[in-house]
Amino acid sequence: MALKGTQIIASEFRASGDRGFAAVNPVTGALLEPRFREACYDDIDRAAKAAANSFDQYRMLPMAQRAIFLEDIGSELTACAPELVARAHIETALPEARLEGELARTVNQLKLFALMVKQGSFVAARIDRAAPERRPAPKPDIRTMLVPLGPVAVFGAGNFPLAFSVAGGDTASALAAGCPVVVKGHPAHPGTCELAGQAIVNAIRKNHIPPGIFSLLHAQGRDAGAALVTHPEIRAVAFTGSLSGGRALFDLGCSRSEPIPVFAEMGSVNPVFVLPKILADRGPSLAEGLVESITLGVGQFCTSPGLIVAIRSAALDQFLESLKSNLEERAPGVMLHEGIKKNFLDGLNGLQKIDGVSRLDSSRTQLDGCEIVPALLRTDALTLLDTPEIAGELFGPAAIVVVCDSRDELLVVAESLAGQLTASVHGTKEDLRGFHKLFGILQRKAGRLIVNGFPTGVEVCPAMHHGGPYPATTDSRSTSVGTDAVHRFLRPVAYQDFPQELLPEPLRDLNPRKIWRMVDGDMSTDDL
């Protein structure tokens, strides 16, 4: 399919404005065709209003039709897989095999949400039947369920051009909830965005879905994003990216005359605690696994382990040598774009200027273009505690080892950390018993705790929680992966003393779809 380089507004391609930009091949530095038009305020306004105008019609569609629509988005993505993967490869430099896996994840994610919608229990129906004979006051009939919020603005991520982008988890969960979406595509891979957007449009047309439920806007600067978040028709925002970007959008959402929730997934250093006994028993193999995790995807994962905490010992010295040698064997990688590389090098250089921080690897010369070599740093607990910015996210293939003098000092380091997406602990059974206090600390700090594993894999399943306390996210109760992601875009409504014919189907006495409901305090799929 020939790329058009225009906005998609209410499922129609629309060209407006004279300003534009082109994607850049990170490997060659060449500009890629075509040029993409910058969204103007009129585009943003049209998209938001179209979403609002389609909301009631979309949310009232039968759940079965909504589920088929989600499945068909996955089918349309699969149908254009060769073209989609090829374009994503030249726009991001990510290997085609990695992109094929990411596409499969994206499609399976849509299928998972379709299954959830088809089953229907996600609306969390609760029924407390009337008790008119109750004294001193009769009990009313009260029934509650979750309903969609309204149009959602989705900001695509740069590091996952498929799974966290136009047809990714935020879009899938919003559509599953019954909310229209207006996507601001990531400017580093606009062609990939357009192809995914076309797949959604094809599914909309195939299923006779209101066209206003989907729009895709292209823009490089922050002005378009700000205009989208502050548009009065937008009811929620989903964002994956930097702390500065996410916080700016969060502040905009809060500053509106009618504030809206901004679910931003932002910075995380994903600490890994390596305990003494396992360090002595399995140091070299742990080092190999850690380096694999640190350098996976050129370190451009929000779950990349950036902080390794251990207690001083001879085994630690050997472990550090293994880390160093494994890291130095890694070939340079190509980062997503020059902006990410610049931020990485600026952060790395800043860390190396701090007294008490040293470089462990051989400090290979950094390369031109978007190529990068990984880095390994070392500091001690006191330096980290005196300079907490050391524990900030450095987005790229680097990690810093924090050497502690005792178990108590390791616990103090854990207590000093800000909110995280993940926290990992490697230890033997004896280690884990001896450091049980560590888990109590980490439970307050992170959204996902891992024992004897690495954080970079994020399984797409109902039990997954991909979130964490600030600054990992703006709302530690929310997740952007797994079926619970749908709850970001739902709110409860209670119906008191409603006649059956006015109640939403999930709250009526008859339960033909056999969804799970809480009835008078007990879970049931029965009719009443």
Language model segments and positions:
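Structural signal for hydrophobic packing residues in well-ordered secondary-structure cores
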Residues: 55, 59, 74-81, 85-88, ...
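Short, glycine-/Ser/Thr-/acidic-enriched flexible segments
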Residues: 14, 159, 188, 221-223, ...
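Rossmann-like NAD(P) dinucleotide-binding subdomain of oxidoreductase/dehydrogenase enzymes
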Residues: 121-292, 313-317, 527-528
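NAD(P)-dependent aldehyde/semialdehyde dehydrogenase
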Residues: 4, 288, 310-421
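N-terminal Rossmann-like NAD(P)+-binding subdomain of aldehyde/semialdehyde dehydrogenases
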Residues: 1-140, 527
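C-terminal core of ALDH-fold dehydrogenases
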Residues: 367-372, 407-503, 523-526
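Short loop-to-beta-strand entry elements in the cores of soluble alpha/beta enzymes
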Residues: 69, 179-192, 213, 260-277, ...
